[in-house]
From Swiss-Prot:
Catalytic residue positions: C388, H522, E524
GO MF: ATP binding; CTP synthase activity; glutaminase activity; identical protein binding; metal ion binding
Pathway field: Pyrimidine metabolism; CTP biosynthesis via de novo pathway; CTP from UDP: step 2/2
Binding site for ATP: S14, L15, G16, K17, G18, L19, D71
Source organism per UniProt: Caulobacter sp. (strain K31)
Domain Glutamine amidotransferase type-1: 297-549
Catalysed transformations (reactions): UTP + L-glutamine + ATP + H2O = CTP + L-glutamate + ADP + phosphate + 2 H(+); L-glutamine + H2O = L-glutamate + NH4(+); UTP + NH4(+) + ATP = CTP + ADP + phosphate + 2 H(+)
Amino-acid positions noted as binding L-glutamine in the UniProt annotation, renumbered to this chain: Y54, G361, F389, G390, M391, Q392, E412, R477
UniProt-annotated binding residues for UTP: S13, K192, T193, K194, P195, T196, Q197, K228
Binding positions for CTP per the UniProt entry: S13, D152, I153, E154, K192, T193, K194, P195, T196, Q197, K228
Protein name as annotated: CTP synthase
EC number: 6.3.4.2
Region (Amidoligase domain): 1-271
Listed GO biological process terms: 'de novo' CTP biosynthetic process; pyrimidine nucleobase biosynthetic process
């Protein structure tokens, strides 16, 4: 029997519902249960694929090609369970489905309304089969996070749907966890419970009585305040769980267990004989985080550095590499535009970095700065890791400054006679521009999800991966033009990874450099704290070695 846990939020956004959901999922896993996490996003966009990184943050891509909320990255990293298209839905998708059904006549002339049609679609999504990763057995728990905060007009159909589900499901098969905020007013020297009381009041006004309150706070909650919250919010004192700020997100499962969150959830379900949790791997990570053997500094040369959430999986993957090497990873965020117009700016800013990371991005803005970062890394022999756009800029840099093709560019930046990088429907064959269409082998213009690649035997990447066959997640419209492969190789930039048909360049590396690798895919999306991605583990190892040399 699958049980359902609904995680809602109140008072303010960005309290960490996704992280709380992931941590609770990890605690249930530690007790031997199978879990799956799902996210309901109330925005009207069909998916976040076209949303600005400054508004939405990272777009997390699943193996089956879904563009989803960054919280699914937390789910995967904490539980190790790969998410799918069936684990994220938006209001836009729901309305799109309903309108298509109405146009087909599926509703037989009925008036289409929020209740029951929208709420039924939401309930159908939540109750859709949730299988373990083998696909053979249903999971024990489905954790469902509702985006936004209680009181948001966009979220009302979702709250109504989960209200109905408590009545639809058998007794003791659902649990409401409400994440809220207990602000500490420094001038008054006291913690305020009123925002939490009002948040729960709003939740109860729409028919939902939370079973557990997870209270974000900067300081410990006094016992009398817990009793006060319990009394006014109609929960047991033991169900008021303290969620203090933590120095590391990977300490959160341990903290929540010590506060009794998982035990309280199991009590709601009447599961009093649940196995004790094995938190040894979380404790090992916490030990490494708090007692590293050293530090490395990675310069991250990006376009969206104002909002760090735009690089959420990348940040975590770099820290996973640090865990693998038992070092603390310090990130120096560099806006790539600062390198444009000043040739010495890159050298001055990157001088103290042990390694350089150039992540993905879209558009011409900041591209020249990323090219200069790649040039600095190549010339100074500093470890360089280029992902997606970062690989493409490394290729352009080599062809401009080593091969002598001074006008090498990308068709993403506008018309060019030297499209070293082109959209996947544009390729140069001889003197002709070849147009590929959606029904050709390469498909459309956006490559999403997991694709296989073949590595060159004996290459650095083959050694790092420990084999020549890999599968990685992609999200891009532009590719390095295979027609320039020979010039790249002549310039020392070896093409050591391709699609199985040999057409699409996937990986480049320099043989005359201690660690210079560019990849077209996004390896950060598959990194886990317990299984750091091999490229990130190797990259941080190279940075650690660089630190010994300088």
């Amino acid at each position: 029997m699958t049980r359902y846990i609904f995680i809602t939020g109140g008072v303010v956004s960005s309290l960490g519902k996704g992280l709380a959901s992931a941590a609770l999922g990890a605690l249930l896993q530690a007790r031997g249960y199978k879990v799956r996490l799902r996210k309901l996003d109330p925005y009207l966009n069909v998916d976040p694929g076209t949303m600005s990184p400054y508004q939405h943050g990272e777009v997390f891509v699943t193996d089956d090609g879904a563009e989803t909320d960054l919280d699914l990255g937390h789910y995967e990293r904490f539980t190790g369970v790969s998410a799918t298209k069936a684990d994220n839905i938006t209001t836009g998708q729901i309305y799109k489905t309903i309108i298509e059904k109405e146009r087909r006549g599926d509703y037989l002339g009925a008036t289409v309304q929020v209740i029951p049609h929208v709420t039924n679609e939401i309930k159908d999504f939540i109750l859709s089969p949730a299988m373990d990763e083998t696909g053979a057995k249903p999971v024990d728990f489905v954790l469902v996070e509702i985006g936004g905060t209680v009181g948001d007009i966009e979220g009302l159909p979702f709250f109504e749907a989960i209200r109905q589900l408590r009545q639809d499901l058998p007794r003791n098969q659902s649990c409401y966890v409400h994440l809220t905020l207990l602000p500490f007013i420094k001038t008054a020297g006291e913690m305020k419970t009123k925002p939490t009381q009002h948040s729960v009041k709003e939740l109860r006004s729409i028919g939902i009585q939370p079973d557990i309150l997870l209270c974000r706070c900067e300081q410990e909650i006094p016992v009398e305040e817990k009793r006060k919250i319990a009394q006014f919010c109609n929960v047991r004192p033991s169900a008021v769980i303290q969620a203090m700020d933590s120095s590391s997100i990977y300490a959160v499962p341990i903290d929540y267990h010590q506060e009794g969150l998982d035990a309280e959830v199991l009590d709601v379900f009447g599961m009093h004989d649940a196995p004790k949790p094995d938190l040894s791997r979380w404790e090992a990570i916490d030990q490494t985080v708090n007692h590293p053997d050293g530090e490395v500094t990675i310069a991250v040369v990006g376009k969206y550095t104002v909002l760090k959430d735009a690089y959420k999986s990348l940040i975590e993957a770099l820290h996973h590499g640090g865990l693998a090497n038992k070092v603390k990873v310090n990130l120096d965020w560099v806006e790539s535009e600062t390198f444009e117009g000043d040739e010495g700016a890159a050298a001055a800013r990157l001088e103290n970095a042990h390694a350089i990371m150039v992540p993905g991005g879209f558009g011409e803005r900041g591209a020249e700065g990323k090219i200069r970062a790649a040039q600095f890394a190549r010339e100074r022999k500093v470890p360089y890791f280029g992902i997606c756009f970062g690989m493409q800029m490394a290729v352009i840099e080599t062809l401009r400054n080593v091969a002598g093709i001074k006008d090498a560019s990308s068709s993403e930046f506008g018309p060019t006679e030297r499209p070293v990088v082109g959209i996947m429907t544009e390729w140069i064959k001889g003197n002709e521009t070849v147009q590929r269409r959606a029904n050709d082998d390469l498909g459309g213009t956006m490559r999403l999800g997991a694709y296989d690649a073949v590595l060159t035997p004996g290459s650095k990447v083959a050694q790092i991966y420990g084999g020549t066959a890999i599968s990685e997640r992609h999200r891009h419209r532009y590719e390095v033009n295979i027609g320039y492969a020979h010039r790249m190789e002549e310039s020392g930039l070896k093409l050591t990874g391709r699609s199985p048909d040999g057409v699409l360049p996937e990986i480049v590396e320099r043989e005359d450099h201690p660690w210079f690798i560019g990849v077209q895919y996004h390896p950060e999306l598959k990194s886990r704290p317990f299984a750091p991605h091999p490229l990130f583990a190797s990259f941080i190892a190279a940075a650690k070695e660089q630190g010994r040399l300088v």
